[in-house]
C-alpha cells in the first residue's frame, strides 16, 4: 500500500526546518545541562496554538494507493486501504450493484483520499470494460457518498521524466513510476530501431507525456509527446505530430528530422477502407454519462459488410464472440504486438497464419455498439497502446506539415533539453 501526503513544497520545507530546529534545540539543551551542575529543571505547561502555515492549519489529508489483486472485489481493496467497515458498507450498498464497479483489473490501483480526521473522503479508480476504461470517482459530502466527475475537475499536464538505466530499462522505468502504458508505448515506438530490453546500465531515457489529473491526483497517462533514448552514446528521438487534416484521428511519430521513425514491423496496411474516424484512442468526457473514459482503440465508421483486413502478417489467436467487443478477431504479430478487430458482422475463412492485407472479417455492429464500425486495438504485452505508435502505417510529412512539425519539435526538444545532465526523475509543466 502506497501513501501520498498532500503536502505543498513549502510545507515540506517548513516541516524539515521544524525537525532541524528540534534537533538543534535538543543539542543546545544537552550541552547546557552538561556545563551546569545541580540545576533542577522546572516543568512548565502551556497551551500552544496549532501549528499553521500561511494562516491555516497544516493539511493532514493524504492519498492511499492500493493495488487490486486477482479475485478482489471493491470491498476487499477498500478494506486493505484502511477504510472503516461502515464506510465500505455504505459504498457497496449504494453502488455495489452497478456493473462498472465490478470490472476491476488485477494490475490497476484504487486511490482513497483520507482526511485529517482519519475518515475517507474520496475514492477513485478505473473500471475495465471491453474497449473502454471508465473513471469512477466517489466523493463524500454531507455524510453521503456521491459520484463526482466533471471536465472542470480534470486537468491535463505534460509530465517530464528522466531515467538512467541501472540493471534493466523496464525495471528502471517502473521504479521511476513511469506508467506501464507509457513503458509499452515507448517499446513500440522504437521497436524498428532497437529493443527497449537491450538498453544497458548507463543508458538514458527522457520522456514527455500527458498525464490526467482529477482533484489533484494523477489518475492516468496519455500519449507520449516526445521521447529520447541514449543507447551506447547514440541519441534516438521521437516526436508526436498530428496535422490539422487528421483532426481527431490521432497523429504519428517522427524522428528529429521529420522522417518516418520506423516501418513498424510490417504494419503498412490500413485495416479497412473507412468513412471517418468516429472515436480516436485516448481519454474523453462522455457527453451523456458525464464520466471520463479511456477509449482503448480507434473506431472507424464504415458501411455494414466492409471487408476488414489483417494490418500485418501474424497468427490468429482468437476468433469468436468476446463480450462487449461482439464478434472479434485477435492476431499476434512480431515484436510482441497484438491487434484486435471488434464488432464484426461476420468472419472470413481465414485461420492460423495470415498475411497482411488478408480479409479476416466484415464490419458490423455486434456487441456494445451504436452502429456499424470497426474497433481496432493494438496491445503490447497485453497493455493497450495507441495504434498509431505501433500498428498503423505512418504517412510522410507534406511540405506544409514539415514547417509545423519543426516548430512543434523545437518546443518539445527544449523541454527535453532541461533533463539532459540533470538527475531529474519527474516534473510537471503547465
Curated annotation (Swiss-Prot):
Biotechnological and industrial applications of this entry: Potentially a good vaccine candidate against N.meningitidis serogroup B (NMB) infections. Immunostimulators, namely cationic compound 48/80 (C48/80) or negatively charged cytosine-phosphodiester-guanine oligodeoxynucleotide (CpG-ODN), incorporated into chitosan nanoparticles (Chi NP) enhance the immunogenicity of this protein when administered together via intranasal mucosa of mice.
Put simply, this protein is called: DD-carboxypeptidase/endopeptidase Mpg
Primary location group: membrane
Q: What PANTHER family has UniProt attached to this entry?
A: CELL DIVISION PROTEIN YTFB, PEPTIDASE-RELATED
Which EC numbers does the record give?
3.4.17.-, 3.4.24.-
Biological process terms in GO annotation: cell wall organization; proteolysis
Q: Which UniProt keywords apply?
A: Cell outer membrane, Cell wall biogenesis/degradation, Fimbrium biogenesis, Hydrolase, Membrane, Metal-binding, Metalloprotease, Protease, Zinc, Zymogen
Instruction: Cite the record's note on assembly.
Output: Monomer.
Function, as annotated, reads: Has both endopeptidase and DD-carboxypeptidase activities. Degrades cell wall peptidoglycan (PG) to allow consummate expression of pili.
Which Pfam family, an example, fits this chain?
Peptidase_M23
Cofactor binding note of this UniProt entry: Binds 1 zinc ion per subunit.
Q: Which cofactor does it need?
A: Zn(2+)
Question: Which organism is this protein's natural source?
Answer: Neisseria meningitidis serogroup B (strain ATCC BAA-335 / MC58)
Q: Does the keyword Protein biosynthesis apply?
A: no
Family matches, as InterPro entries:
Cell_wall_metabolism_enzyme (IPR050570), Dup_hybrid_motif (IPR011055), NMB0315-like_N (IPR054512), Peptidase_M23 (IPR016047)
List ligand-binding residues for Zn(2+): 295, 299, 375
Q: Where in the cell is it found?
A: Cell outer membrane
Amino acid at each position: 500500500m502506497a501513501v501520498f501526503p498532500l503536502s505543498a513544497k513549502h510545507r515540506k520545507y517548513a516541516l524539515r526546518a521544524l525537525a532541524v530546529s528540534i534537533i538543534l534545540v535538543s543539542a543546545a539543551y544537552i550541552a547546557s545541562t552538561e556545563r551546569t551542575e545541580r540545576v533542577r529543571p522546572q516543568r512548565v505547561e502551556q497551551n500552544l496554538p496549532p501549528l499553521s502555515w500561511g494562516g491555516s492549519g497544516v493539511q493532514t489529508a493524504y492519498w492511499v494507493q492500493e493495488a487490486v489483486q486477482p479475485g478482489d472485489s471493491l470491498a476487499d481493496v477498500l478494506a486493505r486501504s484502511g477504510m472503516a467497515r461502515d464506510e465500505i458498507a455504505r459504498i457497496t450498498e449504494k453502488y455495489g450493484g452497478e456493473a462498472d464497479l465490478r470490472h476491476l483489473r488485477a494490475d490497476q490501483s484504487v486511490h482513497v483520499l483520507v482526511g485529517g480526521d482519519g475518515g475517507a473522503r474520496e475514492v477513485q479508480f478505473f473500471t475495465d470494460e471491453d474497449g473502454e476504461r471508465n473513471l469512477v470517482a466517489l466523493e463524500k459530502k454531507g455524510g453521503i457518498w456521491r459520484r463526482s466527475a466533471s471536465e472542470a475537475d480534470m486537468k491535463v499536464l505534460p509530465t517530464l521524466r528522466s531515467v538512467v538505466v541501472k540493471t534493466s530499462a523496464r525495471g528502471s522505468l517502473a521504479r521511476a513510476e513511469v506508467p506501464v502504458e507509457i513503458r509499452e508505448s515507448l517499446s513500440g515506438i522504437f521497436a524498428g530501431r532497437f529493443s527497449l530490453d537491450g538498453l544497458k546500465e548507463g543508458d538514458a531515457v527522457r520522456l514527455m507525456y500527458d498525464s490526467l489529473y482529477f482533484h489533484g491526483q494523477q489518475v492516468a497517462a496519455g500519449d507520449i509527446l516526445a521521447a529520447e533514448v541514449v543507447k551506447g552514446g547514440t541519441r534516438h528521438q521521437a516526436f508526436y505530430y498530428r496535422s490539422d487534416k487528421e483532426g481527431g484521428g490521432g497523429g504519428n511519430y517522427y524522428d528529429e528530422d521529420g522522417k518516418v521513425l520506423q516501418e513498424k514491423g510490417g504494419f503498412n496496411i490500413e485495416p479497412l477502407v473507412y468513412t471517418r474516424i468516429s472515436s480516436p484512442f485516448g481519454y474523453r468526457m462522455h457527453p451523456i454519462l458525464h464520466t471520463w473514459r479511456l477509449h482503448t482503440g480507434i473506431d472507424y465508421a464504415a458501411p455494414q459488410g466492409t471487408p476488414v483486413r489483417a494490418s500485418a502478417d501474424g497468427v490468429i489467436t482468437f476468433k469468436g464472440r468476446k463480450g462487449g467487443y461482439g464478434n472479434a478477431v485477435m492476431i499476434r504479430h512480431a515484436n510482441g504486438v497484438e491487434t484486435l478487430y471488434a464488432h464484426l458482422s461476420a468472419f472470413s475463412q481465414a485461420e492460423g497464419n495470415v498475411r497482411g492485407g488478408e480479409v479476416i472479417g466484415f464490419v458490423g455492429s455486434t456487441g456494445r455498439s451504436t452502429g456499424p464500425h470497426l474497433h481496432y486495438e493494438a496491445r503490447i504485452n497485453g497493455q493497450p497502446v495507441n495504434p498509431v505508435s505501433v500498428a498503423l502505417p505512418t504517412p510522410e510529412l507534406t511540405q506544409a506539415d514539415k514547417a509545423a512539425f519543426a516548430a512543434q519539435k523545437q518546443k518539445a526538444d527544449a523541454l527535453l533539453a532541461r533533463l539532459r545532465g540533470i538527475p531529474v526523475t519527474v516534473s510537471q509543466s503547465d
